[in-house]
Regions:
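Electropositive, gly/pro-rich neighborhoods at or near active sites that engage anionic ligands
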Residues: 1-163
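Short beta->alpha connector loops
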Residues: 32, 205-207
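A mid-sequence, solvent-exposed acidic-amphipathic segment
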Residues: 156, 162-197
């Protein structure tokens, strides 16, 4: 198992799905990084703030969020719990210096917070960038033969997906704060129905980390997969066109460098 090689790590996750082996993959991307660092994080309709850095960009309703350090420490503590948790089959993706806005110092900061490198640490970008075409063409088709739950934005048109969803847990804007109750909803649904062998897809920003941590910790007989915005072009959502280079590269043939970016463990 080589989770530090961008392509081999994808193969490892893909083969687990093919073989119906249960696992969890949870992503600690730049947003989670800033929350762990206790920085103010804001994605608004026309601008962003990350600590002392701010700028202009377009964020549609499904992408908007805000973490206020003075108000939201509970959610930071839960995110830290999820990040520090180690368990067989619990794979955690972190930021690397391949993303220039992250830098090597933040990669090293995450490793230090974690207590050092670990076999279960891999890339937060594992399913995107140069691996994204494989997600669409190799991984997503496997969902058609499985029982699926989906944590997704209420604006998503789930009917457009090329596979069936047994149940959708709808979330809204700033779901990591406003929809924390969904963690218990997912957990209770799994427990009540004694589910085994399901795939739980999560497209819910930092709420995905909470759901995956709390549910997999108690029941590792299902697979939990943080897919971020990977399916957004199929869901009648528009925000990805402004903020997701790997998606515009694949779906719109845009000349974004993210479409061919191979992340490196450094």
């Amino acid at each position: 198992m080589d989770l530090k090689d961008f392509h081999k790590a994808f193969d490892h996750i893909l083969n687990k799905i093919k073989n119906e082996e249960n696992f969890a993959f949870t992503r600690f991307s730049d947003g989670e990084l800033f929350i762990l660092q206790n920085k103010h994080l804001l994605l608004s309709n026309d601008h962003y703030i990350t600590g002392d850095v701010s700028g202009r960009n377009i964020y549609t309703e499904e992408e908007q969020k805000e973490f206020k350090p003075e108000e939201h420490q509970f959610y930071r503590e839960k995110l830290t719990e999820a990040f520090l948790h180690n368990q067989e089959g619990y794979f955690k993706g972190i930021c690397t210096a391949t993303d220039g806005h992250v830098g090597r110092e933040n990669f090293e900061w995450m490793l230090e917070l974690h207590g050092g490198d670990h076999p279960n640490l891999t890339y937060s970008n594992l399913l995107i960038n140069a691996n994204y075409h494989r997600f669409v063409e190799e991984m997503a088709p496997l969902f058609a033969g499985r029982d699926i739950l989906y944590v997704a934005n209420k604006l998503a048109n789930i009917s457009k997906l090329p596979f069936e969803i047994e149940k959708t847990f709808e979330i809204g804007t700033n779901c990591m704060i406003n929809n924390y109750n969904v963690v218990e909803q997912v957990k209770n649904y799994i427990d009540k129905n004694r589910l085994k062998g399901y795939i739980v897809l999560c497209s819910a920003a930092s709420l995905s980390n909470y759901v995956i941590y709390e549910c997999y910790r108690e029941n590792s007989q299902n697979t939990f997969l943080d897919i971020g915005s990977c399916l957004n072009p199929l869901l009648d959502l528009e925000g990805w066109k402004h903020t997701r280079g790997y998606l515009t590269s694949y779906w719109l043939n845009a000349q974004s460098p993210f479409g061919s970016q191979v992340d490196v463990w450094s």
